[in-house]
Amino acid sequence: MANHKSAEKRIRQTIKRTERNRFYKTKIKNIIKAVREAVAVNDVAKAQERLKIANKELHKFVSKGILKKNTASRKVSRLNASVKKIALA
């Protein structure tokens, strides 16, 4: 284990950050999964509703500094393309 106070503090900080990161990563995955599930069953209305939520949440994470702007835009763009594809079909 740690022999210095600063090392003990770093361990505490790492644990706290790891928990926070895991929470956000899981939330992001669940948001994306919800849209993809609606697309998989060709439910256009539900997919569009969930896409709207995903767009809002992902850009909220950008403002909090959890995701980079381009990453969120890429994810939203890909989700939007998949929803648009089933909407036109």
Curated annotation (Swiss-Prot):
<dbReference type="GO" id="GO:0003735">
    <property type="term" value="F:structural constituent of ribosome"/>
</dbReference>
<keyword id="KW-0689">Ribosomal protein</keyword>
<protein>
    <recommendedName>
        <fullName>Small ribosomal subunit protein bS20</fullName>
    </recommendedName>
</protein>
<dbReference type="GO" id="GO:0005829">
    <property type="term" value="C:cytosol"/>
</dbReference>
<dbReference type="GO" id="GO:0070181">
    <property type="term" value="F:small ribosomal subunit rRNA binding"/>
</dbReference>
<keyword id="KW-0687">Ribonucleoprotein</keyword>
<comment type="similarity">
    <text>Belongs to the bacterial ribosomal protein bS20 family.</text>
</comment>
<dbReference type="InterPro" id="IPR002583">
    <property type="entry name" value="Ribosomal_bS20"/>
</dbReference>
<comment type="function">
    <text>Binds directly to 16S ribosomal RNA.</text>
</comment>
<dbReference type="GO" id="GO:0015935">
    <property type="term" value="C:small ribosomal subunit"/>
</dbReference>
<keyword id="KW-0699">rRNA-binding</keyword>
<dbReference type="GO" id="GO:0006412">
    <property type="term" value="P:translation"/>
</dbReference>
<keyword id="KW-0694">RNA-binding</keyword>
<dbReference type="Pfam" id="PF01649">
    <property type="entry name" value="Ribosomal_S20p"/>
</dbReference>
<dbReference type="InterPro" id="IPR036510">
    <property type="entry name" value="Ribosomal_bS20_sf"/>
</dbReference>
